[in-house]
Every structure is written in C-alpha cells, then in structure tokens.
C-alpha cells in the first residue's frame, strides 16, 4: 500500500502547492485575502473534478496498486517489469493523453462530451434544418462487443404515430445489437380517403404513410381542405415532403422516390410502394402473403402489376396484416387446434394444411384453409388464417370421430 499512499500524497501536495501559488499571485496583484480564499476554494473544486473526470487519478492509483502487488510477490514483479518494458515506447503518449484530458476538462469539455464525440458524429444536409446522427467506428465496435446500449427516451405526451416510430427504432437497435436482419412488421391501412375522382395522390400517400407510421393519417380539415396542400404540384412525392414539414414521423431512411440514385435497388426489394397508372392515377400497392394487393382510392383489390413505381418503402418493412381484414378474433371459444395437435402427437397422424386468399363481395380479405388427414378432408373460410384453420380442424375432428 506504500506506493498507493505515495501517489495520493503527490496529488494532495500538487493541489496544495498550486493553491499556494495562486494565493500569492492574487496578493501580488493587489487582490484581497477574501478574494484569494474564494478563488482557491473554486480551484480545489475544479481540480478534484478534473482529475476525477479525466480518469487521471484512478489511472495513477491503479498503477500504484500494480507496483504494490509486484513488491509483495516477485513473480508479479517480473510480470510487471515485462509489462513496462513492452510499453516503454508508448508511455510518453500515455502521459500526453492524460495532459490533454486535463486541458479539455478545464476548458469545460467533460467526460460525457468526450465519450459522445468519440462515438457519434452529426451531419447536416445543405439547406436543411434537420440533423442526422451517425455512428462512428468506435461505437460500432462497442456495440459488437456488447459494451454500448442505446435506449430511446419515452414520453407519454408523444403522439401515437411517434410512439410507433420509437418502437420501430428500438426494434432496429435490438436487431443491430444482435447482428440480425432488421424486419419491421406493419399493418396495411388507409388514411383518410376522399373518393371524388381527383384525390388519388392524397389517397395513395395517406395509405403509404399511414402503413409506415402505424396510425391512420388525417388528411383533411373540417372544411374538407387538404392538411398537406401542395397546390398545383399534386404528386405523392410533394405530399410526403409536405407531411415531413408538418412533423409527421416519416423519415428519408423510410423510403426512396424515383429521382433517387438507388431507387432501382430499393424497388427490387420493397414490399410497399406508390405506383403511377398511365401518369394520371396513383395507388398504394403492397406485398402480403406472397401476393400483391393495392389500395385504389381506399378500395382493397388484387394488384394487376400495371404502372410505374413512384415511391418505394425500405425493404425492412413487411406487411403481415391488413387492417380491414378482421384478423383480430374475439372470444374464439374452445380451440379444436389444440385437440387436433394432441391427436397428431398421440396417434402419429399426418396432417396436410394449405392456405389461400380470396376477396369477399365487400372487398375484404377471406382466408381459406384446406386440411386433409387420411381420407378426411375439409375446406373452411375465415376472416383470419387462424379462424379458417380452427373451423377446418373442427370438421376434421368430427369426421374422424374425435
């Protein structure tokens, strides 16, 4: 402990010597004794904060402990000697780094600022007021090593759309930390729709943005005027820009338009798009259950494949539900699926199960389930895959007498 005590003594003596020198300089300059005491008190506070904030004090104490351990055990002494020999060439740099940290701390640049600056950079687009925060390589390395955790601050006053975007961001961060591919599941939905034959740009943009932000977007005020009015420039690209100006939480990383240099690459992988039909009509199309569907002025239809994409969403977005399909089941009652699975396990029966999708008369989705085991087979319809499968399972159980 002798070396450690000596280091602590050196820090104390250094502080005392510096304070005495400051007091003498103040008096020599004609300053009062009270003023000198005030400055010295402030100096001591700053001195302690600086040596603690920079890590210099802890680093010196740590080395002193190493020396004390080496003095207690000769084997540790040899190892310690090798360590200092191998690092002799960088010892001067280590000292200079400590001095720079002290200078930065005294300039008001604290540890939090240094850490943030070492891991993140801020990029500002020319002509834009918004900023983009970029991860530096140091931050990426720390995430890979599990040493850096990123969390998003929550606030109950946030809108539903913003809360959905925060949850999406947390999913992306979690996937990034675990080295997984980023996938965001979305519900396809319409925003506010006006069926007047002239509002297809607003309708398609409303569906596109509502689906991404996870909340139906209100498009018109009480008088029927568009909230995101773009005048004569009626194009989904301009409407999205207007939405961003009005702080709708959709970001440049969420989509690309056909003027972007990487548009073709995004278009190949995207599952959600705004498509122009004959340069006079716009619809929102999306991929669901390996088939393409569209919202055409709010009406759900199978997509024919005609048209040219104007705007495409990031490939991380995947549609796993259509909001108007009635996919949420309430009080389904006893579950034949569990009974059928028990029979499969108990008797070793093989079950074939396939699903199909058709449109009902009102434009909503109907799921069809074909199920067969042995000579028993059933076809059932439902508002969801699970509902259709449950009905088919009940039919199969009745046929095989269970």
Curated annotation (Swiss-Prot):
CDD domains from the UniProt entry: DSRM_DGCR8_rpt2, NSP3_rotavirus
Annotated positions for site Cleavage: 333-334
Domain (DRBM) ranges: 334-402
Subcellular location per the Swiss-Prot or TrEMBL entry: Host cytoplasm
InterPro entries documented for this protein: dsRBD_dom, NSP3_N_rotavirus, NSP3_sf, Rotavirus_NSP3
Keywords, comma-separated and alphabetical: Host cytoplasm, RNA-binding, Translation regulation
Gene Ontology, cellular component aspect: host cell cytoplasm
Pfam assignment, any one: Rota_NSP3
GO biological process: regulation of translation
One Gene Ontology molecular-function label: RNA binding
HAMAP family listed in its UniProt record: ROTA_NSP3
Biological role stated in the UniProt entry: May play a role in stimulating the translation of viral mRNAs.
Family (UniProt): Belongs to the rotavirus NSP3 family.
Protein name (record): Non-structural protein 3
Species this chain originates from: Rotavirus C (strain RVC/Pig/United States/Cowden/1980) (RV-C)
């Amino acid at each position: 402990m002798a070396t450690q005590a000596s280091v602590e003594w050196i820090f104390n003596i250094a502080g005392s010597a510096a304070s005495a020198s400051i007091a003498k300089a103040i008096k020599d300059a004609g300053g009062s004794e009270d003023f000198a005491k005030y400055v010295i008190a402030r100096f001591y506070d700053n001195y302690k904060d600086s040596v603690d904030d920079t890590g210099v004090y802890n680093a010196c104490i740590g080395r002193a402990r190493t020396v004390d351990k080496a003095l207690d055990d000769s084997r540790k002494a040899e190892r310690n000697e090798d360590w200092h020999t191998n690092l002799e060439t960088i010892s001067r740099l280590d000292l200079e780094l400590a001095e720079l940290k002290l200078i930065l701390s005294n300039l008001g640049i604290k540890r939090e600022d240094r850490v943030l600056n070492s891991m993140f950079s801020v990029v500002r687009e020319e002509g834009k007021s918004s900023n983009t925060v970029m991860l530096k390589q140091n931050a990426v390395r720390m995430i890979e090593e599990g040493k850096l955790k990123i969390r998003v601050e929550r606030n109950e006053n946030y809108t539903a759309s913003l809360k959905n975007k925060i949850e999406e961001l947390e999913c992306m961060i979690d996937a990034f930390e675990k080295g997984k591919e980023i996938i965001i599941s979305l519900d396809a939905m319409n925003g506010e729709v006006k069926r007047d034959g002239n509002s297809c740009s607003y309708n398609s943009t409303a569906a596109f943005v509502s689906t991404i932000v996870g909340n139906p977007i209100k498009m018109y005020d009480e008088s029927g005027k568009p909230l995101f009015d773009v005048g004569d420039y009626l194009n989904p690209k301009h409407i999205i820009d207007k939405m961003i100006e009005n702080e709708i939480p959709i970001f440049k990383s969420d989509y690309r338009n056909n003027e972007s240099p990487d548009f073709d690459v995004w278009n190949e992988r995207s599952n959600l798009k705004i498509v122009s039909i004959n340069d006079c009509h716009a619809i929102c199309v999306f991929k669901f259950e390996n088939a393409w569907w569209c919202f055409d002025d709010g009406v759900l239809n199978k997509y024919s494949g005609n048209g040219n994409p104007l705007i495409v969403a990031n490939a991380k977005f995947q549609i796993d539900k259509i909001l108007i399909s009635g996919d949420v089941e309430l009080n389904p009652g006893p579950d034949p699926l569990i009974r059928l699975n028990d029979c499969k396990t108990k008797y070793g029966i093989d079950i074939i199960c396939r699903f199909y999708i058709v449109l009902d008369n009102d434009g909503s989705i109907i799921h069809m389930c074909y199920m067969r085991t042995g000579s028993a087979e059933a076809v059932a319809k439902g508002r969801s895959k699970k509902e259709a499968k449950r009905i088919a399972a009940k039919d199969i159980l009745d046929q095989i007498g269970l």
